[in-house]
């Protein structure tokens, strides 16, 4: 099977491990990844990234000239895409830029013009209802009408596409898996000692941006409710709420229980997760954000959850977006924004070590079965086979 996948996501080599796993599943699978030659992510990485060609046999990364360097929806590719299509002749064309991506439209048209008869697939994370005006409504309608299958990163996204009239195959699957060789259970006594964490302290962990929608203030309130218990809060990340977090901690006399680490390299994150007795993702749905077509945000997946699960760390999550689906029965769920419900979850794990061990083991098994790079690649390959057979 010849598979062509296009996305700016794979500019970062670390994000390519699932696709490398895909290329190794069976003899005869070839994976060519199209990435923009130049891309400017914005945010903390506000610099232009120039990509390079890589040939690893059945897996290749091919930079193609592009016309937008920092907008997913407007990303389109140059004429060198035509020669790649003619040479590779893909059987699957999979574009990870959402339902309204111009690059997807471009590749659908090229597929038709070159007579490739490849199956068209796109990936989306979008999980809130939206309204479209012309000409964007026509663009999405065209893309949906010419899609043989869709992969949605979450169940809400799949439901929305059904509501918008799509009747073809949809698979719910994350864009990226977890590297189980990196995220694996491994005690960290030296790191714990370095951070001043003693053996009898229950470590509550959070990894992510310090922003309101990630629910950090609810987590702090929950911990203030149980401040007499023996715990420490380990926060990995940075963001606008840092000063408010420190202020609340000082006002409630829990500053000695707080550890903030702003800059941790990705290959060291697993070590810090292994310090945790639980990882909490207390995300909260918000309607403060606006785009051209929609208002709001809710958790689209929560990748850090599967990283913690792979380390046998029990997880607690709010019921925002995809979190309950990711966790299932392998962790604890609380209503978003409810600090009392969250402190109840925390208290259960602190007071019931057997429950914590059981949830850690359940989460580990689920991560190994569903969320490793190889497991995600296998599910993606089976979906491709399904739409080719149809």
Protein language model features and the residues they cover:
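N-terminal subdomain of nucleotide-sugar transferases
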Residues: 1-59, 116
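A short, histidine- and acid-enriched strand-loop-helix "catalytic/donor-clamping" loop
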Residues: 8-11, 98-102, 110-134, 146-149, ...
